[in-house]
Amino acid sequence: MEIQDEVDLLEPQESLTASADSTVDRALSWLLDAQYQDGYWAGTLESNACMEAEWLLCFHVLGIANHPMSRGLVQGLLQRQRADGSWDVYYGARAGDINTTVEVYAALRCQGYAADHPDIKRARDWIQLQGGVKQVRVFTRFWLALIGEWPWEETPNLPPEILFFPRWFPFNIYHFAAWARATLVPLCILSARRMVVSLNKKSCLQELFPEDRSAVVALRKKNGAWSAFFYHADRALKKYQRMFKRPPGRQQAIKMCLEWILRRQDADGAWGGIQPPWIYSLMALKAEGYPVTHPVMAKGLAALDAHWSYERPGGAQFVQACESPVWDTLLSSFALLDCGFSCTSSSALRRAVDWILDQQVLLPGDWQQKLPTVSPGGWAFERANVHYPDVDDTAVALIVLAKARPDYPDTARVNLAIERGLNWLFAMQCRNGGWGAFDKDNDKDLLTKIPFSDFGETIDPASVDVTAHVLEALGLLGYRTTHPAVAKALEFIRSEQESDGCWFGRWGVNYIYGTAAVLPALASLNMNMNQEFIRRAANWIVGKQNNDGGWGESCASYMDDTQRGRGPSTASQTAWAMMSLLAVDGGTYAESLLRAEAYLETTQTPEGTWDEPYYTGTGFPGYGIGRRELKRQRSLQQHAELSRGFMINYNLYRHYFPLMALGRLAALKGT
């Protein structure tokens, strides 16, 4: 169908078009007002109550009494408590999460809340209904061990000697995902030192252990040959360590861990750009005798006050699990470009592109362990995380630079950045044709069997959504399906398509996100969009549209297949669905697109943005192997509450994705 035919189908909706124009104008005004003077955007990143609870526990471990943020963090925790007494992993979850609830419970008791306080009692009653504290994950046990409420002997042993392992060894730290690796190293110090800063008698958690503690805390043996092997290996290692109070090489191993940590502190004071390695590194340094006044410690704590925390009404304070200024700036710039902005007509876009170019990482990182001869050239997700650039941000950076290049005054600078980014991306392609997030071929399933790995995801295999974003960038830069890397990536994407036509979303919720990543990528490569597998995907999208014209999908879809593409409509997921259909054939799907346009127009706030309490970003689906695998559901100890998962509400998703969709729809109409 020719573009002219598509426009004809859309032209009768003149009043809607005028309304949509004002919707876009208001949204653009809001976005431009949200830009920082330096040229970037940074929306709040909401996650779950473990963030605030763990910081309160960390203050206790570090010996920081009455931290200025403590009262606000406590208020934030109380605001999030569910009616049944629990705390959940994401907004709208069907049930609370045992791990989050126990950690919050411990944090509130640590802050002086009595065991008979109504909120504490409600939480405790809920915990006991779930089977008690014995149900918690390994990471929660680590926290309880740090405050003297769980024996270190009954946590998985994390020997610092793992840093001695050569690169070819299956348990070399560089086989773990970047986020797991950066967390594992400081935990090795804490595990080796058996660090304990006990709660006072009034705050101890004896009420959570109504039965004999020894029966509650015993490390559970999991099913499966490898899991059994690691269980017995852990027992043997602990016996060995009891025999040798100072195992040979232990001090040298701890020193290596310490040096590893110190070399990787970010410029803003955090570690790894995310909360877990940051908070565990601070405690590991404390275990090694670093006072909180030491420059490294002071810098790490200062970041918390500087820009990682945010406030909400009622005196509540929260801490972000991560910051996303690079990601937010890339996608905000993408939205401006989709709305017809250029670097010559818009100083805001020009400043954003300047800032993006400045963020390219040209320093070595952990990824070079597998690619020692490859030059840097990627972009990171966070504010100051030069050690861990990622493929997804790099792909979107190349998309933005490719679109902005014609009107950017320094073409040579853009060309050099694109060349460096492309070389890095091609080198990062995995053997199966896809791309992971932070490393090449980070897919050793064996690592998921060790007792430490009962949280989120331990490895970082190739994913469809990241691969699709790379292909979209390559298409914009002139690559086509005949290029070997593109052809191999397309094979991977085709192999991952679900039987009903959609694709799984590793980094966004969920099948709507995965499908919305793939279809624009295929269009970017100038593929024939009438192919059966493509139309099947588009028809799946159409079939999931809600009666209000929008689309939504619950985080529960990661564990409940009946929730695929189902959920209350959200602005971001509606935009993803729209961009999917626009990539395939805007004319054929005009009715769905116009209903979606009306949904966005009628739900826009007077300020020009959209409300979106639902979480549409994904950190960890919780399968433990970095990819979709519902066959493991029984062994996961996870249901729709996603107790192993980590879900995210990117506060700017609700804004720049609708702008992209509306901008592309306007371009199709010729308005």
What are these regions (language model features)?
Residues M1-T671:
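Preference for long, amphipathic alpha-helical scaffolds in soluble/luminal domains
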